[in-house]
A protein has these predicted regions:
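Charge-enriched, short contiguous segments at helix-coil
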Residues: 2-75, 105, 265-309
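Amphipathic, oligomerization/interface secondary-structure segments
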Residues: 115, 119-123, 127-309
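Short, amphipathic alpha-helical interface elements at domain boundaries
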Residues: 28-181
């Protein structure tokens, strides 16, 4: 996420156009998640349980028994396959499952014959969801950028008051947690406060304290700042109504894809070069024999975990 890139890293690290540009936080999370999955994979093996069998059971049996969804199928690598072979065989199965799901959403059922003859290449952004209006995103605009800056940026001076020892790193935390007044701020900050008051984002209450005026709206902005996406149907009716109003005002947009945009970018970064020039390109390199390392290299174990992850 953009917010996880610190000011020093933003200033010092060269960013490429059309690149994913993973930051240090991303790399740390990747390392931790791989270690966790490795531990899980090894523990299952010690219990004589294959992760591949669990995945097959989910698609072949669980969906049918619990949701009456038939004809989903997946063929995972055998126990004796090398990790090089596992990488090559599991990647087409990802496309296969995505095709099955796409047909299920569009037709209400999975037709194995249609799936088998389909030559359509699956792009993550094109996979629809059964849930309409699933994800909410912030529209890129000067207005939204200003709100994000004033409330959530650690570079905005509204966050820092000397009488509070500068203990908050953004204005949102300050106004929520402290009793602050307009005149607590230096003169050079007051024009920014005036703008927020004019836009009816904050107000002075009868005690002269600055408070958030439309809490639901600012909570929407806060979640989009910290998570970059909102799962629409997981929010309260009050928040959903505010989101609808913000969509009418052209502040937000909503989509119905299976994966959020961040998830799409994450998968594309690892599996192909369709979006980012610095991607791992695991899918194409393995399917076309241009992968790094020989066939017995440990790199294939790591890549297999990344694919499963």
């Amino acid at each position: 996420k953009k917010r996880e890139t610190g000011a020093f890293e933003r200033a010092m690290v060269l960013k490429m156009l059309k690149a994913y540009n993973p930051n240090s936080t991303f790399n740390h999370k990747k390392m931790v998640s791989l270690l966790q999955l490795n531990a899980y994979y090894e523990q299952l093996n010690r219990l004589n349980i294959r992760l591949e069998d669990i995945i097959e059971w989910f698609f072949d049996s669980y969906l049918k028994e619990n949701f009456e969804i038939e004809n989903f199928s997946i063929s995972m690598p055998s126990k004796d396959s090398t990790f090089f072979e596992k990488c090559k065989s599991v990647l087409p199965e990802i496309d296969h499952i995505l095709k099955e799901y796409k047909y299920y959403v569009e037709d209400g059922q999975v037709d194995p014959e249609l799936v088998s003859i389909s030559s359509e290449h699956m792009f993550f952004k094109d996979i629809p969801s059964k849930v309409k209006d699933k994800y909410v995103y912030l529209k890129n605009s000067d207005y939204n950028n200003l709100i994000d800056y004033y409330f959530f940026s650690d570079q905005c001076m509204l966050a820092y008051l000397e009488n509070l020892d500068n203990k908050y790193d953004n204005f949102f935390k300050l106004i929520v947690k402290e009793d602050i007044k307009y005149n607590d701020f230096p003169e050079y900050d007051k024009k920014d406060l005036d703008w927020l008051i004019k836009e009816k984002l904050i107000f002075e209450n009868d005690k002269g304290l600055l408070k958030i005026k439309n809490e639901e709206r600012i909570m929407v902005y806060a979640e989009l700042h910290y998570k970059e996406v909102i799962s629409y149907w997981r929010k309260s009716e009050k928040i959903r109504n505010e989101i609808k109003q913000m969509i009418k005002e052209n502040r937000l947009e909503i989509g119905s894809s299976l994966f959020s945009r961040n998830e799409q970018d994450y998968f594309n970064f690892y599996l192909n070069m369709s979006e980012f020039i610095d991607g791992y390109d695991i899918r194409n390199s393995n399917l076309h024999g241009t992968q790094i390392g020989d066939r017995k290299s440990d790199v294939h174990y790591s890549r297999y975990l990344q694919i499963v992850l």
